[in-house]
Swiss-Prot record:
Protein residues bound to Mg(2+): 351, 353, 703
Catalytic activity: Ca(2+)(in) + ATP + H2O = Ca(2+)(out) + ADP + phosphate + H(+)
Residues involved in Ca(2+) 1 binding: 304-305, 307, 309, 796, 800
Gene coding for it: ATP2A1
Superkingdom as given in the UniProt entry: Eukaryota
Subunit structure: Interacts with sarcolipin (SLN). Interacts with phospholamban (PLN). Interacts with myoregulin (MRLN). Interacts with DWORF.
Signal peptide start and end residues: none
GO BP annotation list: calcium ion import into sarcoplasmic reticulum; calcium ion transmembrane transport; calcium ion transport; intracellular calcium ion homeostasis; negative regulation of striated muscle contraction; positive regulation of fast-twitch skeletal muscle fiber contraction; regulation of striated muscle contraction
Cofactors: Mg(2+)
Record region (Interaction with PLN): 788-808, 932-943
Binding site for Ca(2+) 2: 768, 771, 799-800, 908
UniProt-recorded name of the protein: Sarcoplasmic/endoplasmic reticulum calcium ATPase 1
Enzyme active site: 351
Length: 994
């Protein structure tokens, strides 16, 4: 049923053709079940394991590697002699890498538990209904409820469907609907229609929403929506419709993979075509097919060389290390790629309650009447320090510390706060903090009494548990609470009836203490308390009091004010009819006004500094809250989102004002605004969508079920540690301490991680460029193989992988939070950097080929060939006069290959040092600024020595031992790469950046 909240109870009953006292007939239930289905949320269709596995192989680079492995495997079958084992190593290793990558990918996907499944926990098991087949109320499975059912709910129940209240069977009906609307206090419900068809859920005071909890009272209503048609069901549908976009890094790597695969394919084909003339060379036994297969193997080697196989593992390791560092700062990252996304966050949309504020109501101001002379009235105003539930803080008057017990008015004010109160403080020893037991507003009053300590109770020797309610206990020993007149909407107040606890104090007599909304309470006051006496409340005095309350409620602070009053001579207890709540207002008359307290949910201490940091870092902070606009703007001013006297028109909107704008203006509003008040969850999703249309990278905080769709839609969904399971499972990050400052620390960490990732991605890519150049040169010049695929795999995975991982530990730049967020469209490798890595890669390739050629041409233990002989080695036979005196087996020697591999590994280690900083010289940033890098270089070189000198590894890798003379040549060829990169950095620093 649409807009049930705007209809009368009678209209709702007529719509479903049902009688409140009888309920639906069996036939009506059957028809409704056919029409609306069962009252449950459909389960999410998950992907099968097979679908997840196939997904892992959709990446182009992975497919090229898979093809290379299959081809190598087929070619290995046709190998002869002792090379058979070596031939099988390569496809086996490639397959192992692919399987490991797929396992990690599938495991990560399976681990991201489904937020839609978590919604199920809000579905109650049972419901209570009236139906025509039974005279009394009956319990049925909640899934069998249908629209039109007459349902009953009572304190402690979970609401089983969306229900329009028909009648309330208790004084009040309080509902905790925080999971759905984010309201921090329970809401009082009524039965009258809400005439606004566009009312937000917070304003639908005659509706009960599925999954929310009844805090107090009992009611009967008619079910108006079940299953996916409930408010919680709409959230489920919105989440199911939200597609998860790829993170900026994933998009970059995908683009890079596509470009790389095209380049690889071109080079492989080129190498094969260049050598068509060599297919018939004698070395292939004159067989054109064997020659074609030989060069096909070289093309496969090229593919293996060009793909940085170690990259996925290094990225995962770097992100995992980043998540550990973030966890230490209370930011628990649930999805690894989002660590990097945090680095480009340009807008943070933050909830107010609990994130920017403490979510611990505290009284910060109060006043009592000092003097009344005729129509002139002067007030004593006090301020109170301390912004949490901890009973620590001072009472100040004109910025000076005072003892509250010296003011009679404050003693009575503290008495009312302690007795007219059903809440208390509790010290949580596990967390080491004070927490509320009961309503936030009342707990603030309990805390105020502790700070005031009007009877000078000695609290120094008490434990924290005893300290929680020490001063309240003293007051409660003086007066005994007989009964409570519950809060009701019509009078907007509550009261307690108290009698003196001891016979000695009988002279005081019984009292009624009242607290409530100032207008309602003051209207029922006839007197004002001045010291220990009372004087009549004249219109002028009343006006003065209300003026101060209005100023407190609308000024910079927008405090929530409560008036406190006493009825000095209440009726006798036996004369009061407590069963009839309509009489309560009558008993709360002839009151004496005692004072007023102003409270607020105070901003967290560290938030102002964090917002300043965001501004310096070019990040816009938008506050989104369910509170009213005045309060929202006041908090924005207090924490620095708006300055004290900044004009906020066009920069702050309520949900209703936002809805009234045409779509183009809504989009523009999202570009300018920094504050949205009185919003619904759908607004949050809309705001995220509009921000994304400006290419903003948005972080969105939330804690309720209602926030889940927006959390899922934003690039970075941030759930509160104290939030619901649904919010947590829909988010990328959870704040263990619910603190806004933690988000800013996480953004800083994300920026540092991205900078380091850029360094190691570039390091690995320049290494691969070197390997490609090496193989291309050997094929193009007709030289013997310098490197084979199994060696390339070893270098890509192990030797390069360790320093690349260590580059993830580079210290962050000092000015990292002084720069604007990087654009998600910024390329991973710019034109200049591409040139740099081509230059470095070109040197790496040429040096590797040069090392192998050096042994053939110039080494003392080498064959001392001519350049012509080396480049035409395929024509070497005993009958060829050009190769007279040359043993053709020399071209199979492992020494030149070992030289080439050793030069490649040593150059890569030098290159890792170059990658400490993008443009800083090694003289400014010496290697020991990242001790992990120094350690990983030592480990990589040690592993290289292992495959050279520990049998049987040299046989598997087709290598041999090198002597000192060889190593000196390796170092001479490798070291210049540092000088080359220093020259390129110098150009970048002095000519490009300038």
């Amino acid at each position: 049923m649409e807009n049930a909240h705007a209809k009368t109870a009678e209209e709702c009953l007529a719509f479903f053709g049902v009688n409140e006292s009888v309920g639906l007939s069996g036939e009506q239930v059957r028809r409704a079940l056919e029409k609306y289905g069962h009252n449950e949320l459909p389960a999410e269709e998950g992907k099968t394991i097979w679908e997840l596995v196939v997904e892992q192989f959709e990446d182009l680079l992975v497919r090229i590697l898979l093809l290379a492995a299959c081809i190598s495997f087929v070619l290995a079958w046709f190998e002869e002699g002792e090379e058979t084992i070596t031939a099988f190593v390569e496809p086996f290793v490639i397959l192992l890498i692919l399987i490991a990558n797929a396992v990690v990918g599938v495991w990560q996907e399976r681990n991201a538990e489904n937020a839609i499944e978590a919604l199920k926990e809000y579905e109650p098991e049972m419901g209570k209904v009236y139906r025509a087949d039974r005279k009394a109320v009956q319990r049925i499975k909640a899934r069998d409820l249908v629209p039109g059912d007459i349902a009953e709910v009572a304190v402690g129940d979970k609401v089983p469907a969306d229900i329009r209240i028909i009648s309330i069977k208790s004084t009040t009906l309080r509902v905790d609907q925080s999971i759905l609307t984010g309201e921090s206090v329970s809401v009082i419900k009524h039965t009258e229609p809400v005439p606004d068809p566009r009312a937000v859920n917070q304003d639908k005071k005659n509706m009960l929403f599925s999954g929310t909890n009844i805090g107090a009272g009992k009611a009967v209503g008619i079910v108006v929506a079940t299953g996916v048609n409930t408010e919680i069901g709409k959230i489920r549908d919105e989440m199911a419709a939200t597609e998860q976009d790829k993170t900026p890094l994933q998009q970059k790597l995908d683009e890079f993979g596509e470009q790389l695969s095209k380049v690889i394919s071109l080079i492989c084909v080129a190498v094969w075509l260049i050598n068509i003339g060599h297919f018939n060379d004698p070395v292939h036994g004159g067989s054109w097919i064997r020659g074609a297969i030989y060069y096909f193997k070289i093309a496969v080697a090229l593919a293996v060389a060009a793909i940085p196989e170690g990259l996925p593992a290094v990225i995962t390791t770097c992100l995992a290390l980043g998540t550990r560092r973030m966890a230490k700062k209370n930011a628990i990252v649930r999805s690894l790629p989002s660590v990097e996304t945090l680095g480009c966050t340009s807008v943070i949309c933050s909830d107010k309650t609990g994130t920017l504020t403490t979510n611990q109501m505290s009284v910060c101001k109060m006043f009592i009447v000092d003097k009344v002379e005729g129509d002139v009235c002067s007030l004593n105003e006090f301020s109170i320090t301390g912004s949490t539930y901890a009973p620590e803080g001072d009472v100040l008057k004109n910025e000076k510390h005072i003892k509250a017990g010296q003011h009679d008015g404050l003693v009575e004010l503290a008495t009312i706060c302690a007795l007219c109160n059903d809440s208390s403080l509790d010290y949580n020893e596990a967390k080491g903090i004070y927490e509320k037991v009961g309503e936030a507003t009342e707990t603030a009053l309990t805390c105020l009494v502790e700070k005031m300590n009007v009877f000078n109770t000695d609290v120094r020797s008490l434990s924290k548990v005893e300290r929680a309610n020490a001063c309240n206990s003293v007051i409660k020993q003086l007066m005994k609470k007989e009964f409570t007149l519950e809060f009701s909407r019509d009078r907007k107040s509550m009261s307690v009836y108290c009698s003196p606890a001891k016979a000695s104090r009988a002279a005081v007599g019984n009292k009624m203490f009242v607290k409530g909304a100032p207008e309602g309470v003051i209207d029922r006051c006839n007197y004002v308390r001045v010291g220990t006496t009372r004087v009549p409340l004249t219109p002028a005095v009343k006006e003065k009091i209300l003026a101060v309350i209005k100023e407190w409620g609308t000024g910079r602070d927008t405090l929530r004010c409560l008036a406190l009053a006493t009825r000095d001579t209440p009726p006798k207890m036996e004369d009061m009819m407590l069963v009839d709540s309509t009489k309560f207002a009558e008993y709360e008359t002839d009151l004496t006004f005692v004072g007023c307290v102003g409270m607020l949910d105070p901003p967290r201490k560290e938030v102002m500094g964090s917002i300043r940091l965001c501004r310096d870092a070019g990040i816009r902070v938008i506050m989104i809250t369910g509170d009213n606009k005045g309060t929202a703007i006041a908090i924005c001013r207090r924490i620095g989102i708006f300055t004290e006297d900044e004009e906020v028109s066009g920069r702050a909107y309520t949900g209703r004002e936002f809805d009234d704008l045409p779509p183009a203006e809504q989009r523009e509003a999202c570009r300018r605004a920094c504050c949205f008040a009185r919003v619904e969850p759908t607004h949050k999703s809309k705001i995220v969508e509009f921000l994304q249309s400006f290419d903003e990278i948005t972080a969105m905080t939330g804690d309720g079920v209602n926030d889940a769709p927006a959390l899922k839609k934003a690039e970075i969904g941030i759930a509160m540690g104290s939030g619901t399971a649904v919010a947590k499972t829909a988010s990328e990050m959870v704040l263990a301490d619910d603190n806004f400052s933690t988000i800013v620390a996480a953004v800083e960490e994300g920026r540092a991680i991205y900078n380091n990732m850029k360094q190691f991605i570039r390091y690995l890519i320049s290494s691969n460029v070197g390997e490609v150049v090496c193989i291309f040169l050997t094929a193009a010049l007709g030289l013997p193989e310098a490197l084979i695929p199994v060696q390339l795999l070893w270098v890509n995975l192990v030797t390069d992988g360790l320093p690349a991982t260590a580059l993830g530990f580079n210290p962050p730049d000092l000015d990292i939070m002084d720069k604007p967020p990087r654009s998600p469209k910024e390329p991973l490798i710019s034109g200049w950097l591409f040139f740099r890595y081509l230059a470095i890669g070109g040197y790496v390739g040429a040096a590797t080929v040069g090392a192998a050629a050096w042994w053939f041409l110039y080494a003392e233990d080498g064959p001392s060939l001519t350049y012509h002989q080396l480049t035409h080695f395929m024509q070497c036979t005993h009958h060829n006069a050009e190769f007279e005196g040359v043993d053709c087996d020399i071209f199979e020697s492992p020494v030149p290959m070992t030289m080439a591999l050793s030069v490649l590994v040593t150059i890569e280690m030098c290159n890792a040092l170059n990658s400490l900083s993008e443009n800083q010289s090694l003289l400014r940033m010496p290697p020991w600024v990242n001790i992990w890098l120094v350690g990983s270089i030592c480990l990589s070189m040690s592993l290289h020595f292992v495959i050279l000198y520990v049998d049987p590894l040299p046989m598997i890798f087709k290598l041999t031992h090198l002597d000192l003379a060889h190593w000196l040549v390796v170092l001479r060829i490798s070291f210049p790469v540092i000088l080359l990169d220093e020259a390129l950095k110098f150009v970048a620093r002095n000519y490009l950046e300038a």
